[in-house]
């Protein structure tokens, strides 16, 4: 494989010395970019983009051609995994992802088996294609949803604002939810390992809905399964470590628990103070975050002030990957995203000694 020209992101994840704080943005390839919208129109649909390695490569590289980001992230969707489990993913215009066959009855749940990786070959082909196209420019991140977050969509049949179906199952028939989570966990381990085999140089587990759980339920139904995934992942490829990032949106109160599951880095949303997070778990893990994505609607001068505040809060030294606290808004101005990247690179050098 081609030698990495910029490995700052990987070094920061392992808390090795760096010259500046690296940055990438969740959902950095997305609707806020006019070039993405043009490619999406050519592809004909969102799944048309995801299932074509050529299109997926094109849109993955678009933000890197526009901004000097320190990592690329595979363009895909977390719901490709339950789709490969036979739930029938489709995207309703203006409504987001839906499943034709949500898991509501016991027979369907008992019949659920781990995803057939053969049905996800298009993802692994995309990883290989992107890695080749990057030619060592920056590392490539692979990703998956967490077992619980996937289960939310699988049981609800799509997005939800109250998770009443999955929560009803959790409290009244927990053994059924555990069956789904078991199938999801086996699927995610195989899925992420296949991405690593195809060329992913780091992986992130997106636990988008873990923060909707009670303290006890989070540990039993989300964290325990993510711990099993981390333990089951290949941690070395091309002679170097493949770091693992775990991100629970709304998980700031559980940082110590999350940091204990064996991941290299914990992602933070914008509601957690990164300096306090470092004091709590910084000896054990790197931290990723945690700029409020809606602060990108402010003027560049305000964006720069917020960058400085976050860098100052984290303090001196490595172990920080700058990111948004969640995905970038489709309504964000690309110029403001550019201002964010520029400010992080320029201002963060004061927080790192000679590397």
UniProtKB/Swiss-Prot annotation:
Annotated GO molecular function terms are: uroporphyrinogen decarboxylase activity
Question: Among its keywords, does the record have ATP-binding?
Answer: no
The catalysed reaction is:
uroporphyrinogen III + 4 H(+) = coproporphyrinogen III + 4 CO2
Q: Can you tell me which residues the record assigns to a coiled coil?
A: none
One GO cellular component term of this record is: cytosol
Q: What class of enzyme is it?
A: lyase
Q: Which domain of life is it from?
A: Bacteria
Its pathway is: Porphyrin-containing compound metabolism; protoporphyrin-IX biosynthesis; coproporphyrinogen-III from 5-aminolevulinate: step 4/4
* Compartments where located: Cytoplasm
Protein residues bound to substrate: 27-31, 46, 77, 153, 208, 326
Q: Pfam families from the entry?
A: URO-D
List its EC numbers: 4.1.1.37
| UniProt subunit comment | Homodimer.
The record's section on HAMAP family has: URO_D
What role does it play? Catalyzes the decarboxylation of four acetate groups of uroporphyrinogen-III to yield coproporphyrinogen-III.
Give the family from UniProt: Belongs to the uroporphyrinogen decarboxylase family.
Indicate what this protein is called per its UniProt record.
Uroporphyrinogen decarboxylase
